[in-house]
């Protein structure tokens, strides 16, 4: 049977891609990628696009749900492009990711007799992120929207409270929207390159509790910055830093090269593996701090350093990995290009 657009086929999902689509095969062996499906699903699928050896489809009906399928805990799932696995259990997500690693090593890498240890899973699967970048735009009716981009697009899905972010981030967005309305702040249009406010970039120190709010603008600043600071300070006692980042380039890169602090410090602090670090808008910092501590601890265990050894931390960036091991060696040397 020749597969055509809008054909309806029955599929059993047998595997998954890195982007979260399930994969099933037709009776003719053609792979069909179905977003929002789960391994084990028996589905009625409408074909959306046909290529030479594969096709894309969407779920018309779930005939028999996978045992791993759960009710998504976010109303924006399948609209927002941020998450791919909210419709399956975390245990199933880890299982899929483990299988992808094993396939990469054995099938692609061609290595045999490799022992794979189980994934070290995260204790927290919600509210664990310490940074978010919210694009700001206008919908078709001219209303201000902030949130995250739709899957494979630059269409902003309005999201007032992402369950991966601390709840305080949602309050920052609400205050900022109030400020935009009061001051009639122009919103950046990436198509024309005109407008002022591009992104709202928020960081928090999980241990310190310190909050940084950075506004990315297509200008040198915002109008009535004093009012903005006053509005933020009045409701956010943990506010440590408010920064204006200028990005006048017509680019997908979020941050420009120039920062200007309009309140407080130019950085916040946080703690990783007992060490305190300063974090600016430009700093690389692990998004999931607690999981990073597990990762670094395991790396330190595998390194099995001796007190008379010199540790080279190559392409070290901030140097967090090496610094967390410095107490176990004679000398630490970090190198960054």
Where are these regions (language model features)?
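Accessory RNA-recognition modules of RNA-modification enzymes
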Residues: 1-337
